[in-house]
Amino acid sequence: MFKINQNIYNKIGELGVYIYTLSLFISKSGVNIGLGFLVLAFLLYLWDKRKIRLTTEEKYILVILVLLLIFSVFSAGGTHSFQRALEKSYRYLPIFFIPLFITNERVIKIILSLFSLSIFISFINGIFFYKKLKWNFNARLISFSSHPLDEAHILAMGSLLLLALLIYTLKFKKYKELPIYLLAFILALIALVMTQGRGAWLGFLGGLFVVVFLLMKNKKLFIVAVILVGVLGVGAVTSKGLENNRYIKRFESIQNLEDTSNKIRLFMWESSIDMFKNNLPFGVGRDNASKYALEYMEKNHKYDEMEHKWAKSHLKQIAGSGNLHSIYFTTLAEEGILAFPFIGMFLFILYRQFRYCIARERDLNFYLVVGTMGMLVAFLVGG
């Protein structure tokens, strides 16, 4: 049998990781190209009869992915939902492939630099977006994503990883990497604010709490700092100078149930619960919620509860898109009872990461795990 030089598929895999990482914030095509190189490297890896050892977390994820496909077949969406689930499952492949080709710290540092560069490019493109709008900063930032919410959530997650890296570079005096991480972190925060994504803001705050908690050895000092920041934050938000700040007003609007956006979100959540109850155990199927959401709004006279004509039209548009405005309610409606082990998967990963951080010495891996924990918490809180 033809023998493959291990160095060849390792280099192909590394190239795939680099392209994938650089493309995260800027190009879906780039992500797919990077994934293509990773798949090729993985096939060569198998050809070379290399053993694959999955971690407990990877086994859990793999089982869930298989069950997602099975549930999609038997869901109300049938073959259509199965096809959509199959198309979207490729997003999880890097979880299994990337660790195979991160062979040393040099590769990790290149990956992190490319991650930061991806944020730079995304931010610059976002500035060009505002230039087209004649610098109308009331508009929500869109860079390479098709929707500001997508932009907001990935920025919230990315900024938390960068924060952990910043602390690492300062603690270990890695001043060569400090400028790129610091600039990327600042730009990510600015862009995050400009997206006006309230859920992403909450996600960032939740992830920030976890990151700071894990990085501060003195937990009493952490509690004092949280209380102090909370008091100062409330004082700043309620001060006269910031009472008309559009970003603060947007954040405060989360609790306003009469706000049109919030009302639509609640109606979509109600419809998802209705879908779950009426389509047990398999759900309505992947990307198949729009028909049921529209039926729910019509049957329960939800359009009549909207005050303005444009609000009724907007509700119909959102319902028709099948966007249920929450990973939890979307999973509940589309995947049925599988939603519970699916969400449990993320909580299990968090638990394993937390245990790792408690027992681990504070090296680069520790800070990377803390950063990815922050990312996962931001994802789960932002929902």
Residue ranges, per PLM feature:
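Membrane-embedded alpha-helical segments of multi-pass membrane proteins
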Residues: 28-48, 85-96, 150-159, 202-209, ...
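A membrane-periplasm/extracellular boundary helix in multi-pass inner-membrane enzymes
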Residues: 194, 215-262, 270-278, 286, ...
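Transmembrane signal-anchor hairpin modules in multi-pass inner-membrane enzymes, especially those
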Residues: 1-83, 101-113, 165-179, 220-225, ...
